[in-house]
Amino acid sequence: RIDPEDDTDFSARFAGEISGGLSVIWERGTFPEVDILYQHINSDGVTSLDYPAFISSDPGYQYAPILSGNIENGLFAIYGDRGAGSIDLKVQKIGLDYLPDWQGTGLVAMDGLDGDVNYTQTYRIGNRDIYHVWEDNRASKKIYGSRLTDLFIEERDGKQLTYSDNSSSETDFSTPVILKTDNKIYTATFDGSSSPKFIRVNKMDENLNNAWDSSGVSLSAVFDMRNALLFETSDGVGCVWSESRGFNYNIYYQKLNENGEITLENEGVELVDSNGDDYIMAVEPSPNEDGKFMIFWMEDAWPAATLKFSKMDVEGN
């Protein structure tokens, strides 16, 4: 048991270490008073702190904590703070002593500006640098990002990364997708300004500048697209999604090169066609190092869903 208090604990997130240790961050309390706490467990299963450390104990609602990195190379706690009414994005560095390293409740990475912040992603660049990328509804839903170096934020309230319509919704599995590679960031958003809803893919350089058209590259849809996933290829990026062009949702694939040019047939290549609704779960390079990819998906067919996998090359064969 990592929390000695008899309270409500939930939304736990974890970060493992090569040494076998484990960092845990979670929410304690019930709305509207919720705090963020942290504890470290060593490789012997013993907690490193006598009592969990408060990442945030400010009045109000702090929520949705995540961890990025590890203790050895730099560990950061990221969470939303709704104590002031709008939702601020906050960051706290956790030191080698397993205690908060920055003063107070950490650094305000982005002021909420009375707009909801969703789908936050954090990517560590080096020991003292991280990217923050998120969806922000300060005026309309768009993807924003910023780079944090030590205590310096390049874009105080975030830099707008996408400019096209972003009709994200968890109801129809059309949430934005963000992929960080060695020196690029790719985004996939769902444009619902016309029917059918379709995907736009864009690429940012290491300074978060649009490398392609600011509206992104649109993928051709026959019916509404949903459940997208991006993965890196040798010459660009691949996008996989679900679409119902018949009775069920099948899985389709499109590939874009470094210049944002579509390289497969216009409406994509069909990867999976089953008797149920198919939703992509993961795409990973083949462990055989043969240049191919393992794809994993869920086939949702009565009476139960099934996890399946297959193998494909970069052209979708």
Protein language model annotation of sequence segments:
Residues 1-317:
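Extracellular, repeat-based ectodomains that mediate carbohydrate processing or recognition
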